[in-house]
Amino acid sequence: MTIRPFARADLSATVATLARAFDQDPVMMWIFPDERMRRRRLPSFFASSLRGIPRAGGAEVAVLGGRVLGAAVWLAPGAWRPPLWRQVVALPGVALRLGSRLPAASTTYGALLRVHPERPHWYLSGIGTDPPMQGTGVGSDLLRSRLVRCDADRLPAYLESSNERNVPFYERHGFKVVGELSIPGGGPTLWLMWRDPADGPDQEVAQ
């Protein structure tokens, strides 16, 4: 298995893998409670996200025999908050993809932005492994690949876990829970996790 930077030629396979990986994700189930709608909308959701990634920091894919087994979507320091003009330009397409679920998605996005740390960091906006390959080390290899860079650059990393069962996985890679967030309106709870670079001092996370 090889971990390498995401390329445009990987788009279709990576979108399909992430859509399968996030089909039962609590946040995605909250935004798209209808299973058929969720399976229709997730591919376009991830396609839109990935198209903007190369200029926003980079994604990495785990590949074996030409098959994308998993992907990690990262945003470089400062890139987690898109400029207002980009949000305005993207709004019509976002509204089209989300339809009647736009309010739920907007509530979720707004809640996440309000608690996002301001201190420079790499942001893991999503990581997913094709369900048949989960538990085989794909996710760990993807995570380690970028965390090595974080350590070399002396930069922290941040993520939100929407599943409490995944918290120990991230803790094994040096992340610590620094807070919990319940999405307003009856949405799921997310665990906010921070990782200082290896061998670096523990520092208070600046919100």
What spans do the regions from the language model cover?
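Conserved GNAT acetyl-CoA-binding A-motif
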Residues: 120-122, 149-162
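C-terminal "cap" of GNAT-fold acetyltransferases
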Residues: 155, 159-164, 183-207
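Conserved GNAT-fold acetyl-CoA-binding loop/helix
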Residues: 25-47
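Conserved acyl-donor/pantetheine-binding loop and adjacent beta-alpha core of acyl/acetyltransferases
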Residues: 68, 73-128, 134, 184-188
